[in-house]
Every structure is written in structure tokens, then in C-alpha cells.
């Protein structure tokens, strides 16, 4: 019902405000109450200033503002209150719309300046609890699967309030706030927490939710409320509703905080925003924030590192497997009811699954809109045809729970691959799956193929990286050896040392090409380099050939003898440096053969064994 205000706009008016003795179930927003109090106070002042002589036969100025034809009596105050609430109801913004109140209108502009208008945020159905219905008027439902309900009294057409929505109202009304778990005081945020706090004299908050829920519904025959299966489905649906309720509570807190800061924010944007504990406390969630202790605990929990890690992990999991579907608020059971009403035939579980994940090609229903769902369905079809034959009609035939169990590799994370939540858990067991297991290898999914390809690329990258590291180490060692030999040559008055060619380490049974070690075209003996020299060490698969036969055995230090050269002791009978007598380690002789100091070229030729008859054997007399 609408009424015209002074500006010509239509505004909704309340038809009933209840009896005078009954308490108001709706108090209105803060702005509404503030404006109402200001107008009533102004009305009393105007009535008092008019004097007793003006009360008879004359209307006051305040009464003219509210209702020109009404006398200034208590009834005028009631109508003024109703008019103010009607304006405030139109001006109050819904949370989802993000509108702001514009303050008082022209008639109350002066009064509104006394209290600046605040942003009015009103919530819908959050704290509205319907009274219990008579038994014959309650909605008839039937338990399905592990957490689903089928509404028997619904014909599958039109709009209806989802059953989980009604259950969520009961859960919020009987919210236990702070509970004790493991000796610690925490805010209830799991369905099991509802059972940790008593409600009344002989029950808990769980029993209160149970009573409130069955005040709106009744179970169909042959089920009764005493059946364990009914209790199992109720607990499963309540657990799911609590998770969704707490998830949306954080998003609501982020949305309200951002709007109070003057920023636009919706639920999708709030998913990626994490506030601090203080910022959460500055916001509100209507059904939760009035429990001050529980609200403060939840604000601290939402801002903790533990929650951030869990939130980011779950968000990445959802992004990796989006799980796009078209079930909407009806869910699987509601979608089946609408399909039955449209087609006149009760659909099978697979037909509902395909309808909820309908792909682009109607001629190929097995190709769905989501790759993950397509892979699950393909594995299910393979299992069904392997069990019942290649001509089995998998779409319209009876749903095979065992094939669905195998298609998902069991029940990872407690979820069945197809029909999770609508298939009773008692219809499949791990024992039946393993006893009837198939020897046929499972077809790898596209995600597994991507992971395998990434692992192969990583292994190839690691192999290339190791090869580069080895090459760098080889270059570094060669550079260090070159610097070491160059320093030794400068110390003993020799020209800069030229690094000899690197000879590849010969494979067993083969001899290296001695021509790579020959210098100036001289002809040497037929003895291979492997017979003449011992390797100093293998560097990067290559051998350095300039070390003597036993490079690690150093002779004792003698007087007037410089330290041994880094590449080992020089050939027998030769001096370590020019100007020193040659040393012969002959046993018992003690004689030293004086010989002229060799020049540098002779020393290098002998050292590198590049002369035709040079060898490591001592000279013969």
C-alpha cells in the first residue's frame, strides 16, 4: 500500500503497528528512531508553546505539519510516528544495494542538523524467526543421500524458500556464542559446537535447532523423527549450512567495513580482501556482532595467520578446480523436481548431473562444461561399460554407485565423484570397491597429464642446470691451474707458462692419440701417453696429462732447495730450477753429478716430455 508524501513521491506506509501493549518486533534503523524522537520532541514543544487557549477548536502548527485535518491529540503523535517511519523505511538502504540515507527532508531539515545522518544498513531475514506452523500446514520433506532433502509437497514450479535457508535461520537464532572445547573458550563456528552448550533445562543448542526446524517441516512416511537416517541427514545438512553461514559472515563483515569507508564492495570482491582484527571489529554482522565475546573472538581468528593459510589454500583449491555448474539454489534435488515438472518424467541421477553441467554440444552429452566433471563422467562410463557391456545405456540406466566410487578413486575428502550428497553413504563401502576392483589401469586425467608434463620439464631444466654448473666448475678449475702455474713460472724466472692441450680420458681398451701431445713435429716412441703419464685428476670428464707417475709422493725437503713445484717432482736427474745442481736419489751412493744448468727451453721440453727420447727413467751412465 502506497501513500503520497509532500514532494509527490510514493512511499509505503505500515498498515498495522500491533496492539499498544505488545512490544515492537521491528525497531527500525538508527536514523529512523532518531528522526522519530526529534519530531516527537518538536511536537511536544510546539504544543506546549501554543498555550491551553489554543487547544480547543484550533490546530497547532505541529499538527498541521503532520496531518492538517487532525487535532493535536495523542492520535496525532501516533500518526506522526507512522509517517516518519514510512519515510525512513523508504530512505533506509539495503546492504546489497549500497544506498545511503539522504537525511531529513525539507520539513525536518532543521531538526536533522542536530544529529548528522549515518549510513543505514539493514539486513533481511537474518534474525526473522517464523512461528511454528500447525502440523498439517508444515512442508513435507524426505531425506535424500547424506545431506539433501526432497520436498514432497512441491510440484517443481515457481519460487520456494530453500530448505537450507530455513535451517540457517534456525541456526542463527540458536547460535551458542562462546563454548568450551578442550578447556578453551572459543566462539562456535562448527556444527559440533552447537552441542557443547546447554539450552534451557534439558537440552543443548543442537536440540533447540532440531525443534525449530521441525516446527516448519514434517517428514514423510515411512520415515519418523526417531529414525537414525533422518538424524544423519539433518546433521549433514546442518554441518554444510554452518560452514556456509560462517563463510558468508566474514564476507559480510568485509563488505560492511568497505561501505562504511565509502568504497564499493560486493561479495566477489570481499573474497580477496582480508582485514585486520581491529578493522573487523569496526564492522558488524547482525546475527553475530551482538554477541560481543564471540564477535571479538571471530575477528581475531579471521585475522590470524592460521586462518589466512587455510583461506588461501582453500581458495587456490577452488581456483584449480572451479567446478562450474548450473544447479543454482535448487541443488541437485531441486533441479530433478523442476526437470520432472517440465518433462513429465522422473529423471535419473545421471540426467540431472548432465543437465547441471550441460556442455555446448547436445549431441554429445558426455562432454560437459567443466573438464573435471567431464573426466569423472568418462571414467564412470568406462567402468559401467566394462562391467555391463559396451552397449550399456549409461544415461538412462540405473545409477551404478560402485562405478562412481571407482571413477573418483574412492571418496577423497569424503566426497563421491558423482552424486555426492544425494547418494546414501550406506550404498557404497570401501570393502565392495576393493573386492571388485578392476585390473584395467585408470585413464590419467588432464590435470595429471599437466602435472606430469611440468615434472618432465623441471627434470630437463635441472639436468641442464647441472651441466652448466659442471662446465663452470671445469672452467674455474682450469683458470685456477693456469694462474697457479703462471705464478710458479714467474717466481723461478721462467717465461709465462703455456697450458698444454687437454687430452680426453681414454675409454677402457683404447689409447689416446699421442699426436695431440707432440710438439714441433718431433717423432716420439710408440708408447702411449697413458703409459708415460699418470692423470693428475679428471676434471669434467677430461684428464690433465702433465703430472709424473706418482704426483702425490713428495721427497723430503733438502737444504738450499726451493719448495716442490705444484705439478709434482721434476724428472729424475733434473734440477727443480736453473742454477741448482741436479739431484740423484740413488741409494747409498751419496754422489752428486755436476752438470751445467739447462736452459729454459730444455727444462720445459723435459718437463712436458715433448722431446723424442725423453722419459721419466733416470739417465744411463
Curated annotation (Swiss-Prot):
Residues 1-119, 428-447, 498-530, 549-621 are annotated as: Disordered. GO terms for biological process: transposition. Residues 82-102 have a biased composition (Acidic residues). Residues 27-39, 47-61 have a biased composition (Polar residues). Keywords: Activator, Mutator protein, Repressor, Transcription, Transcription regulation, Transposable element, Transposition. Residues 570-594 have a biased composition (Low complexity). InterPro entries: EN-1/SPM, Probable_transposase_24. The keyword Repressor applies. This protein has most probably three functions; the mutator (M) function, for excision and transposition; the suppressor (S) function, which inhibits residual gene activity of certain alleles in which inhibitor elements are integrated; an activator (A) function is proposed, because inactive SPM can be activated by a second SPM. PANTHER family: AUTONOMOUS TRANSPOSABLE ELEMENT EN-1 MOSAIC PROTEIN (PTHR33157:SF14), AUTONOMOUS TRANSPOSABLE ELEMENT EN-1 MOSAIC PROTEIN-RELATED (PTHR33157). This is Autonomous transposable element EN-1 mosaic protein. It comes from Zea mays (Maize).
Amino acid at each position: 500500500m502506497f501513500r503520497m508524501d509532500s514532494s509527490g513521491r510514493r512511499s509505503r506506509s505500515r498498515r498495522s503497528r500491533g496492539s499498544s501493549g505488545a512490544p515492537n518486533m521491528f525497531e527500525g534503523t538508527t536514523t529512523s528512531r532518531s528522526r522519530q524522537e526529534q519530531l516527537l520532541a518538536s511536537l511536544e514543544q510546539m504544543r506546549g508553546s501554543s498555550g491551553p487557549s489554543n487547544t480547543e477548536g484550533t490546530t497547532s502548527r505541529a499538527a498541521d505539519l503532520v496531518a492538517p485535518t487532525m487535532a493535536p491529540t495523542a492520535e496525532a503523535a501516533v500518526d506522526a510516528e507512522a509517517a516518519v517511519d514510512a519515510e525512513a523505511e523508504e530512505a533506509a538502504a539495503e546492504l546489497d544495494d549500497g544506498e545511503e540515507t539522504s537525511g531529513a527532508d525539507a520539513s525536518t531539515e532543521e531538526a536533522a542538523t542536530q544529529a548528522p545522518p549515518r549510513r543505514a544498513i539493514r539486513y533481511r531475514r537474518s534474525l526473522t524467526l517464523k512461528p511454528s506452523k500447525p502440523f498439517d500446514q508444515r512442508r513435507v520433506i524426505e531425506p535424500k543421500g547424506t545431506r539433501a532433502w526432497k520436498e514432497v509437497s512441491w510440484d517443481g514450479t515457481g519460487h520456494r524458500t530453500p530448505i537450507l535457508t530455513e535451517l540457517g535461520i534456525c541456526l542463527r537464532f540458536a547460535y551458542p556464542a562462546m563454548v568450551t572445547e578442550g578447556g578453551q573458550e572459543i566462539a562456535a563456528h562448527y556444527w559440533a559446537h552447537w552441542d557443547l552448550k546447554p539450552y534451557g533445562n534439558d537440552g543443548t543448542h543442537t536440540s533447540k535447532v532440531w525443534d525449530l526446524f521441525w516446527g516448519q517441516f514434517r517428514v514423510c512416511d515411512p520415515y519418523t523423527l526417531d529414525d537414525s537416517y533422518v538424524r544423519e541427514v539433518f546433521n549433514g545438512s546442518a554441518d554444510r549450512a554452518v560452514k556456509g553461514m560462517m563463510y558468508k559472515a566474514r564476507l559480510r563483515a568485509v563488505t560492511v567495513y568497505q561501505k562504511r569507508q565509502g568504497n564499493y564492495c560486493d561479495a566477489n570482491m570481499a573474497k580477496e580482501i582480508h582485514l585486520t582484527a581491529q578493522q573487523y571489529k569496526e564492522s558488524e554482522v547482525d546475527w553475530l556482532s551482538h554477541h560481543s565475546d564471540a564477535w571479538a573472538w571471530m575477528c581475531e581468528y579471521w585475522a590470524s595467520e592460521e586462518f589466512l593459510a587455510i583461506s588461501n589454500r582453500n581458495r587456490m583449491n577452488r581456483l584449480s578446480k572451479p567446478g562450474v555448474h548450473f544447479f543454482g539454489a535448487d541443488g541437485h534435488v531441486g533441479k530433478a523436481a523442476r526437470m520432472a515438472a517440465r518433462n513429465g518424467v522422473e529423471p535419473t541421477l545421471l540426467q540431472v548431473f548432465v543437465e547441471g553441467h550441460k556442455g555446448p554440444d547436445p549431441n554429445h552429452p558426455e562432454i560437459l562444461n567443466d573438464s573435471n566433471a567431464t573426466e569423472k563422467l568418462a571414467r564412470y562410463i568406462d567402468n559401467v561399460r566394462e562391467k555391463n557391456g559396451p552397449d550399456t545405456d549409461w544415461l538412462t540406466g540405473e545409477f551404478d554407485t560402485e562405478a562412481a566410487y571407482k571413477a573418483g578413486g574412492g571418496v577423497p575428502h569424503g566426497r563421491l565423484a558423482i552424486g555426492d550428497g544425494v547418494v546414501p553413504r550406506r550404498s557404497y563401502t570401501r570393502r565392495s570397491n576393493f573386492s571388485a576392483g578392476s585390473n584395467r589401469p585408470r585413464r590419467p586425467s588432464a590435470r595429471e597429464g599437466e602435472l606430469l608434463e611440468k615434472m618432465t620439464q623441471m627434470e630437463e631444466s635441472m639436468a641442464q642446470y647441472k651441466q652448466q654448473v659442471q662446465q663452470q666448475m671445469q672452467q674455474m678449475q682450469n683458470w685456477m691451474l693456469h694462474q697457479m702455474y703462471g705464478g710458479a713460472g714467474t717466481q723461478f724466472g721462467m717465461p709465462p707458462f703455456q697450458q698444454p692441450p687437454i687430452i680426453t680420458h681414454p675409454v677402457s681398451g683404447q689409447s689416446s692419440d699421442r699426436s695431440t701431445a707432440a710438439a714441433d713435429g718431433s717423432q716420439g716412441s710408440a708408447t702411449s701417453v697413458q703409459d708415460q703419464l699418470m692423470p693428475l685428476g679428471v676434471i669434467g670428464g677430461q684428464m690433465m696429462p702433465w703430472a709424473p707417475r706418482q704426483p702425490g709422493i713428495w721427497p723430503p725437503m733438502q737444504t738450499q732447495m726451493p719448495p716442490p713445484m705444484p705439478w709434482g717432482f721434476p724428472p729424475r736427474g733434473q734440477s727443480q730450477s736453473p742454477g741448482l745442481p741436479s739431484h740423484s736419489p740413488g741409494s747409498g751412493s751419496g754422489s752428486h753429478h755436476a752438470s751445467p744448468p739447462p736452459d729454459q727451453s730444455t727444462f720445459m721440453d723435459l718437463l712436458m716430455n715433448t722431446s723424442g727420447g725423453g722419459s721419466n727413467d733416470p739417465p744411463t751412465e
